[in-house]
Amino acid sequence: MNDVSQKAEIKEMLASDDEEESSPKIEKAYVPKLTGTVKGKFDEMEKHRQEEQRKRTEEERKRRIEQDLLEKRKIQRELAKRAEQIEDINNTGTESASEEGDDSLLITVVPAKSYKTPGKTKDPEDLDREEGNGRTNHEEDKMRYEEECRVLKEAKCLSLVMDDETEAKKESHFPGKLKSTFEELERQRQENRKKQAEEEARRRLEEERRSFEEARRHMVNEEDENQDRETVFKEYRPGKLKLSFEEIERQRREDEKRKAEEEARRRIEEEKAAFAEARRSMVLDDDSPEIYKTVSQESLTPGKLEINFEQLLRQKMEEERRRTEEERRHKLEMEKQEFEQLRQEMGKEEEENESFGLSREYEELIKLKRSGSIQAKNLKSKFEKIGQLSEKEVQKKIEEERAKRRAIDLEIKEREAENFHEDDDVDVRPAKKSESPFTHKVNMKARFEQMAKAREEEEQRRIEEQKLLRMQFEQKEIDAALQKKREDEEEEEGSIVNGSTTEDEEQTRSGAPWFKKPLRNTSVVDSEPVRFTVKVTGEPKPEITWWFEGEILQDGEDYQYIERGETYCLYLPETFPEDGGEYMCKAVNNKGSAASTCILTIEMDDY
């Protein structure tokens, strides 16, 4: 019966063990990891890190145990030396006491070993559990052993002090003995502190080296991952993203600039072609007046007066065009001479610092514009010349900047390759690593300085491009102003053709002020100059005043009154957002008064 019952119990235990084995297997089911995914790599890295941490803890534990053993041996040697000194000093009657004291001090604490009681064989799971419990018990025993070692050290120190005191009492006939013992203790304590500090510094160095190794290993892993990604995605280049975007942005700006130049060139060609056709038609009209006479006589019998009036108008228009062309040629020649003089005066300074020369020329043009001594046509011609000169210079600068950037990129790549080879050498020969463990950091610092320098150069280049765009924008504004002036002249000519001359004659006969050219609504960019122009006639000459939002504006630096015959201007050298609003020009004489208003809109500058 006993055998049967024992067999039944064994079967039940085996069944219970199978259930216990099955339950954790169900709970901790094996999930295959995708080796190619990022999650699988992170899991592998985590497992690798945990294994390294466990190895480090085991090495640290072994090192501490060895250090404790060395300290114990040192203490034993010091106690033995101390006993020999006491024996030499006493020589009589104290040998037994000193030996007993030394024996008491030489007691060593041995950690209790965990004895296993013999018994019956158990299952592998029970053995694993017992091993786990044994590990925890072993760690607790080690902690207890370290605590006991610490207490033992304190007890030894106290016993040394007590022995010194008893020896001082016994040997009172030796003056200065107590002081010498305290000095020795103080020396030992300082030496221990020094050793502890050295050990702490050594430990920190080891930790820093390990962290540096881990960081370098992570960097190598990241580079390997980047190389794998490069093989999968050939177009993806890590580290070049910013440069590629900047190159794309530069190309986009160059394309826009090229398109704008082509558009302006096409517009100028169209204007030239239209002007040539108009001149050709005018020449044909002058060569064959008889044809027009016959046509007009056939269509209109009383048309002689109309033909004569048209001929007079054509003659006037031709004379005005010839006069304007001659004035334009004369102004162009004068401006060429002025520009040549400026170039001769600037000389070598312009060659050494082209950008500074352009800015000075630009400032001079602004001063001339503010003083009101030149018109928009002069500004346009000068800006065209400056643009023709500056395009080549800007292109040269862009090419130089690109060459510099390429050289910097090549240097950075070479240094990175050198650093990578140095890291390989360090991995192969770890003895050299301990001599200079922070070479990679120094190279990274130099690389960061180069990147900062390249960023500053890129910022300078962007500022120069913005200056060029600003000059182009101002040139466009001048073109728009000239176009507006041309339209105004055409409207005036149209009004003359439609018979508005009779109204002008009536206004001039009355003598009251009358605006030939009234104010018009304008818009200007913030901080740019603006000019309000009117043409006023009257007999006697009217007095002109300018008003802003119902308040009179006095002539000064901020608001400049300009008068040229019948043309009156209000010039603002610089505009602000608060300058936007309603402006009025008022003309008064003894025959009457007249006023013209407009609205100024200030637009914000996007540059």
Swiss-Prot record:
Phosphoserine, modified sites: S16, S172, S281, S288, S296, S495, S500
Q: Which InterPro entries match?
A: Ig-like_dom, Ig-like_dom_sf, Ig-like_fold, Ig_I-set, Ig_sub
| Statement: the UniProt record of this protein carries the keyword ATP-binding | no
Report one GO cellular component.
cytoskeleton
Q: Which PANTHER family match?
A: MITOGUARDIN, MITOGUARDIN 2
Q: For the region Disordered, what residue ranges are annotated? A: 1-143, 165-268, 419-444, 480-514
According to the UniProt entry, its GO molecular function terms are: actin binding; structural constituent of muscle
Record-given protein name: Nexilin
Q: State the species of origin.
A: Mus musculus (Mouse)
| Phosphothreonine modification, residue list | T301, T502
Record localization: Cytoplasm, Cytoskeleton; Cell junction, Adherens junction; Cytoplasm, Myofibril, Sarcomere, Z line
Keywords for this entry? Actin-binding, Cell junction, Cytoplasm, Cytoskeleton, Immunoglobulin domain, Phosphoprotein
Q: How does it assemble?
A: Interacts with F-actin.
Ranges for the Ig-like domain?
513-601
Q: Which gene encodes it?
A: Nexn
Q: GO BP, one example?
A: regulation of cell migration
Compositionally biased spans, kind Basic and acidic residues: 1-14, 40-85, 120-143, 167-221, 228-268
